[in-house]
């Protein structure tokens, strides 16, 4: 258990560093498929019987003749993720060191930790770590690193600074945002990711019409089984999304709409029930129970859906809305509690979905996806 990292030394020998509580190093064979016979195998450091979290998340780097191992663990007296570093001038020698950063940035006791360090062309060093932030997931944290007696010093006065200045190697270059709106007129933008392996036979992107269409491939028992669900990561501290759905080609029992995707998901959608269209909220509880709340018959097969999420200080709540014919937004269902759990082990995401509950071959057409960050939510 725990993550691992490989390193190839300058003499061509290969090693893997791994473990949880106890961190081990094992020499590998030339093709990295097995331990090397009679190769190096030893315990490097131990945080044995830590009641919260022992050392894990190994990153090993060789810098200026020294080997550095960066690890995460928790303080023993309470849950507080903490970054540790140990170093040695030999893989067979003693590794010394300890904690190098214990700071939650004033946020809910969630320590910044786990990662490694990188240098820039101008000789500056930075650590790339992350902070658990509740249902929105893990947020990357960049902080400066300096050196004292060959040992890294993280942050400023033991803390993550609120702001740092970095020099770009591509001045003037315009970076595309990681999330944002899409009219589907320019192909699938890099900001989108499929929930799991997509099946191109069952989705269609029509750039001329600005539509993304999902056709159901198989009968599903719930949303997380749906194929070709298209997702974007949600943003801290709050965000919202809207999309227009044409449900005219749904088959009986199909459900299509907009979701806050995780194992305990919330979704607002449209279904076909006894030949009539109904809007509904899907409410997947922490205990695994799925509720379909507040089903409302509507006359139109085209609907706008909106989902708002509030992650501030780990509030972790989602709210669903719908509207007909561009009228007022109407709330549907209850305020939904979101979670960051090990079963999905990822931050919450907006998702466009369509799945079949009774028979396959139905489809839903999505257009005009709009993404709002905290400054744009009214």
What residues fall within each predicted segment?
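Blade-edge beta-strand/turn elements of extracellular beta-propeller
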Residues: 1, 27-53, 86-107, 150, ...
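Short, small-residue-biased leader/transition segments that mark boundaries at the very start
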Residues: 2-6
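Residue-level detector of Asp-centered blade-edge/turn motifs that repeat once per structural unit
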Residues: 9-12, 62-65, 119-122
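Conserved beta-propeller blade signature
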Residues: 14-18, 68-70, 125-128
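Structural motif
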Residues: 22-29, 78-86, 136-142, 315-319
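Loop/turn-rich, solvent-exposed surfaces of beta-rich toroidal or solenoidal domains
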Residues: 52-96
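Repeat-solenoid scaffold signature
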Residues: 103-151
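Extracellular glycan-recognition regions
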Residues: 143, 150-378
């Amino acid at each position: 258990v725990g993550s691992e990292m490989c390193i190839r030394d300058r003499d061509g020998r290969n090693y893997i560093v791994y473990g949880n509580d106890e961190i081990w190093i094992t020499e590998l064979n030339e093709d990295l498929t097995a331990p090397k016979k009679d190769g190096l195998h030893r315990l490097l450091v131990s945080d044995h019987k830590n009641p919260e979290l022992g050392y894990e998340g190994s990153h090993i780097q060789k810098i200026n003749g020294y080997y550095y191992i960066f690890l995460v663990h928790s303080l023993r007296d309470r849950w507080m993720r903490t970054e540790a570093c140990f170093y040695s001038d030999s893989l067979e020698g003693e590794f010394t060191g300890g904690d190098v950063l214990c700071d939650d940035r004033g946020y809910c006791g969630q320590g910044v930790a786990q990662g490694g360090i990188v240098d820039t062309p101008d000789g500056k060093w930075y650590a790339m770590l992350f902070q658990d932030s509740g249902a929105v997931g893990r947020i990357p944290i960049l902080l400066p690193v300096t050196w004292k007696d060959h040992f890294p010093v993280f942050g400023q006065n033991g803390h993550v600074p609120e702001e740092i200045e970095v020099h770009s190697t591509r001045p003037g270059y315009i970076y595309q945002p990681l999330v944002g709106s899409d009219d589907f007129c320019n192909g699938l933008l890099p900001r989108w990711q499929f929930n799991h392996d997509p099946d191109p036979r069952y989705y269609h992107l029509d750039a001329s019409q600005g539509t993304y269409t999902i056709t159901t491939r198989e009968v599903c028992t719930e949303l997380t089984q749906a194929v070709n669900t298209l997702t974007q990561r949600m943003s801290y501290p709050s965000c919202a999304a809207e999309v227009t759905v044409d449900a005219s080609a749904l088959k009986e029992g199909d459900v299509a709409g907009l979701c806050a995707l995780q194992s305990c998901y919330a979704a607002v959608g449209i279904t076909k029930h006894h030949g009539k269209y109904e809007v509904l909220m899907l409410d997947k509880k922490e205990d695994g129970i799925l509720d379909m709340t507040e089903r409302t018959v509507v006359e139109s097969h085209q609907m706008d859906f909106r989902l708002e999420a509030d992650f501030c200080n780990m509030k972790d709540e989602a709210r669903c809305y719908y509207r007909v014919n561009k009228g007022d937004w109407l709330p549907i269902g209850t305020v939904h509690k979101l979670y960051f759990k090990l079963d999905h082990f990822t931050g919450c995401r907006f998702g466009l979905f369509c799945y079949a509950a009774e028979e396959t071959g139905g489809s839903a057409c999505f257009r005009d996806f709009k993404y709002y960050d905290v400054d744009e939510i009214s």
